[in-house]
Amino acid sequence: LGEILRLAVRDPSYMMIFAGFFSCGYQIAFITAHFPALVTEMSAPIDPLGWCGDLGIETTAALGGFAISVIGAANIIGTLMAGWAGKRFGKKWLLSGIYAGRSIAAAWFILTPITANTVLIFSFAMGFLWLATVPLTSGLVAHIYGIRYMATLYGIVFFSHQVGSFVGVYLGGV
């Protein structure tokens, strides 16, 4: 086990997986902790005659809660599709696309006015990419190092995800 750990920490591929999952945790925790409050405080007023009113969303606080539920629903779809795609296409390229997609979605959201429509679009896009990294990351670790060491090496990568989560929540509140 010691030998494979030394090999992994010297492997640029493993360190990229480690760093990627750190950023994944950062993004997810940052959005989970701070996005509903951002929507509540910064969103344009809700149009009671629009689609929000049809869904019973009458306040920006309700829109923030709805946004998290959209992220959750889209996450189911995105994660299943990522697992399916990971069997057919290169996992590292799919992971790169997911991380790039998150960056594009975040940049788009930052550059647009915060309305119910932009919140919904961002929530779906981010939700679709939310945990789509998990089957690809674990599959990539297993592919590179084999099933025998997958649990240990993926566990270390997952630890980086949790550290990234802490940093994302903490820095968002500073």
Task: Give the ranges of each region predicted by the language model.
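Membrane-interface elements of multi-pass transporters and channels
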Residues: 42, 46, 88-89, 114-115, ...
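Extracytoplasmic gate region of multi-pass secondary transporters
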Residues: 6-83, 134, 168-169
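A late C-terminal transmembrane helix in Major Facilitator Superfamily
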Residues: 131, 144-174
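Cytoplasm-facing, short amphipathic helices at loop-to-helix transitions on the intracellular side
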Residues: 14, 91, 147-151
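Hydrophobic alpha-helical interface/terminus motif in multipass membrane transporters
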Residues: 35, 39, 140-141, 145
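Small-residue-rich transmembrane alpha-helices and their cytosolic helix-loop interfaces
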Residues: 21, 68, 72, 99, ...
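Flexible cytoplasmic inter-helical loops of multi-pass small-molecule transporters
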Residues: 1-3
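C-terminal transmembrane helical hairpin of 12-TM major facilitator-type secondary transporters
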Residues: 28-30, 62-143
